[in-house]
């Protein structure tokens, strides 16, 4: 059943692999059980399976999507859910495709759920998905450096931050805005990047100090989430 992902375009397939790998590492840092970690990882791998039925001209469009195109793109969540629910072996993992674009503050889709109603596995997958979508060189995004990505994700996961930081941030459609992601999970993401050198990025102590000074954060050196 998982072989159907091989028919996705090469970028979406690689993105699914990245999100699954990062989700697994986040679960490990959260000290999740082995069973829950395996479950989350498969949910993450399947999270974009609904894109099998999104027209290529929309999925691979190099420019920004129109409102109409974005509405079509959003259907990949419910399409993915339906694919999983129709297969007995995939049915347990249907939460990954359905909920990975929900936001803690209720601004997500397809159901506009808030934190108390969003499954925890989906909250983890959302953070991994946000990170990989920003770091990866997408057809419809300009490549953003790892340093800026980490700063933006963590900065916008802190309480009291505005939704619109600047005109520059408005270009980053996937950035984690106020209330959108779970900051506890973001902390684990940050440690994953530093400790596991995700995307083969090395970080010096001076780099860490710069981020901490810029964002006035103390979470960087926390050993437990």
Language-model-detected regions and their locations in the chain:
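Histidine- and acidic-residue-rich, metal-dependent catalytic cores
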Residues: 1-219, 223
């Amino acid at each position: 059943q998982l072989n159907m992902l091989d028919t996705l375009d090469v970028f979406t397939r690689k993105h699914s692999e990245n999100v699954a790998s990062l989700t697994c590492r986040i679960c490990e840092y959260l000290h999740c059980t082995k069973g829950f970690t395996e479950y989350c990882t498969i949910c993450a791998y399947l999270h974009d399976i609904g894109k099998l039925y999104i027209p290529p001209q929309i999925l691979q469009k190099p420019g920004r999507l129109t409102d109409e195109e974005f509405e079509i793109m959003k259907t990949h969540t419910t399409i993915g859910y339906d694919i999983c629910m129709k297969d007995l072996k995939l049915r347990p993992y249907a939460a990954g495709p359905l909920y990975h674009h929900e936001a803690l503050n209720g601004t997500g889709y397809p159901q506009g759920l808030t934190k108390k109603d969003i499954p925890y596995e989906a909250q983890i997958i959302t953070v991994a998905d946000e990170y990989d979508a920003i770091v990866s060189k997408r057809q419809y995004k300009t490549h953003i450096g790892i340093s800026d990505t980490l700063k933006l994700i963590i900065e916008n996961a802190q309480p009291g931050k505005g939704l619109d930081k600047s005109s520059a941030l408005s270009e980053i459609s996937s950035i984690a805005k106020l209330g959108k992601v779970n900051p506890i999970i973001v902390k684990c993401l940050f440690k994953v990047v530093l400790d596991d050198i995700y995307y083969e990025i090395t970080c010096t102590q001076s780099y860490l100090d710069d981020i901490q000074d810029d964002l006035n954060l103390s979470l960087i050196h926390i050993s437990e989430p």
